[in-house]
Swiss-Prot record:
Primary gene name: psd
Organism field: Rhodospirillum rubrum (strain ATCC 11170 / ATH 1.1.1 / DSM 467 / LMG 4362 / NCIMB 8255 / S1)
Family listed: Belongs to the phosphatidylserine decarboxylase family. PSD-A subfamily.
Lineage start: Bacteria, Pseudomonadati, Pseudomonadota, Alphaproteobacteria, Rhodospirillales
Tagged with keyword Nucleotide-binding: no
Active-site residues, Swiss-Prot/TrEMBL: S194
Name of the protein this chain belongs to: Phosphatidylserine decarboxylase proenzyme
Length: 236
């Protein structure tokens, strides 16, 4: 029997992404200043500081460890699933439409991004753009974005794209071309509220449906080693 012991630290003391400490320090300093000026203002200041800590949380994930599994690189809601043409800058091989899974992250979701599958980083492409609402389909082509193409073996590739949104104005990618990565490995962050698109290899079927909640590094989006058909969802 395999067992996971859940401790209180798992929920009350999550790790903080390094990107967050600067913002947490600023919020805390402003809160202290407000307390010196008008003591009642410490309450909204504390609320915002705690929210900042919550936003930049970086909890440990239990990553499904089996060859062929593709996990979601972002926490949030599966917004769109369908066959589309990937952005031209990806130059995927073979060219043509692919199944795209779009995950939208609200300001309340964990914004630490993870690699959806193990492989080698073949290409990283940054594209400047607009900051329209990330829930719109056109955001994948119009918005500022950072794209990563992974070689995943057997002459296959997979791409995922960090997309800025209406509020999100900062994309961070810690990967470099030629780097080997593991499934679920931390690769970056987007602040504050945004979207992440995953382009599956040809023939792969999505195993999630629009409206489904997902957890970065844990929720399985596809199984490249299985012939299971695409899953559909029903709202109940």
């Amino acid at each position: 029997m395999r067992r996971f012991d859940i401790g209180w630290k798992t929920y009350l003391l999550p790790e903080i992404h390094p990107e967050g400490w600067r913002f947490i320090s600023i919020f805390a300093a402003v809160t202290f200043g407000l307390w010196l000026w008008q003591d009642w203002l410490v309450v909204p200041g504390l609320v915002l500081t705690i929210w900042c800590v919550y936003f930049f949380r970086n909890p440990k994930r239990t990553v499904p460890d089996r060859l062929g599994l593709v996990v979601t690189p972002a926490s949030g809601i599966v917004q769109m699933v369908g066959l589309v043409d990937p952005p031209a800058e990806l130059a995927l091989d073979p060219p043509g439409p692919r199944q795209r899974i779009s995950v939208f992250m609200s300001v309340f979701d964990c914004h630490v991004n993870r690699c959806p599958v193990g492989g080698t980083v073949r290409k990283i492409v940054y594209a400047p753009g607009k900051f329209v609402n990330a829930t719109l389909d056109k955001a994948s082509a119009d918005n500022e974005r950072n794209s990563v193409v992974l070689d995943i073996g057997q002459s296959r590739d997979l791409a995922f794209v960090q997309i800025a949104g209406l509020v999100a104005r900062r994309i961070r990618c810690d990967l470099v071309e030629g780097q080997s990565v593991l499934t679920g490995e931390i690769m970056g962050l987007i602040r504050f509220g945004s979207r992440l698109d995953i382009y599956l290899p040809p023939g792969a079927a999505p195993l999630v449906a629009p409206g489904q909640s997902c957890i970065s590094g844990e929720t399985v989006l596809a199984d490249l080693a299985s012939a299971e058909p695409e899953r559909l969802g029903v709202l109940r």
